[in-house]
Amino acid sequence: MRLFQLLPPFLKVIFLTSAWTLTALAQQPKPSPTKLAPELTAALESHPGLVYAQYGERQMQLDLWRPKTAQPLPAIICIHGGGWFKGERSAMANLAQALAAKGYVTATISYRLSGESKFPSAIQDCKAAVRFLRTNAAKFCIQADAIGVTGLSAGGHLAALLATSSGVKQLEGDGGHAEQSSSVQACVAMGAQSDLECTRISELSSKPNDPFYRTFLGDSQAKIPQIYALASPRHHLDQSDPPLAFMTGELDDASTHADETRADLTKLGIPTGLTLIPNAPHAFLGQQQNFNICLQASEAFFAKHLKDSRKP
C-alpha cells in the first residue's frame, strides 16, 4: 500500500482500472459446465453458425436447436453476458438445448461487443436476430407470433431492452429483414440491470475506471443522459410490452431484483415476477442446482406466455 501511495497519479489510475477490470472479468458468466443427458441432445437437431446479419464483411452468427419434429414451435433467443465487452454465445448453449428439449426452437446469438462497436450495436444485433427467425419461420418450423428471449447479466439487460423497445427506430439497425417485426412475446431477464437512469449507475459510470457503462455507452450517465435513457429497459415501458420476468441469484446485487421496473410493469397490467435462486451468485448458470432451478422457472414462464396463451 505504501508503494501505491508513492506512484504518480496517472499510474494509480492505470492500476485501479486494471484491478477493477480483472475483478469484473472474474465475476462475468463463463461457459456453463453443467451437464445435459445424452438422450436429450440426441433428440434435437442443430444448425450451428447461421448468419443472421451482415455488416460489410462482418458476419453475425447464431446456433439453433429444435426437437426433431415438423410441428411449428415457439422460439426462444438466449443472449450471453460478459459486461457487454466479452463473452461468447456458447455460454448459453446448455440452457438453449435444455429449453429446446422442452418444445422450443432456441438460438444462441453472437453480438457486437463494446470493444468492436458501442451502443446501440449490441441491441441492434439482437433485433436483427429476431427478424431473421421470423423471416425463416417456415424453414425452421417456428411460430412467428411466439418468440421469447432470455439472457444473463449483460445478456439479461439486452433481453429486457429487446422486450421493452419494440418500435424504437434508433435501436432497429440495418441488420436486414426490415420488413419483419423485432418484437418478442415474453422475456426472462436474469441478473439484469433494467434501469440505467438510476442513481447507482450514475455513481458507477462517474468513475474514470468504470469498465462497463462508459465502455458500452460511451461516457458517464451525467455526460450523456439521453443515451442511458435510450439503453434503459425501464425507460421504454408501455402497455404494449410483453410479459417480463426477472431472475437473479440471492447473492447478487439487489438492483437485479428490478423492484421499480416490476412495480411499473404491474401498474401497466403486464405480467411480471421475480425468481430468487437461493445462495446463488451473479453468474449462477455454472452450478447444476442453480441451472435446474433456472430451467424450471424459465420454462414455466415461457410455457404460460408462449404456449398456453395461444391455445385455441
Predicted regions and their residues:
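Short beta-strand element of the alpha/beta-hydrolase
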Residues: 72-82
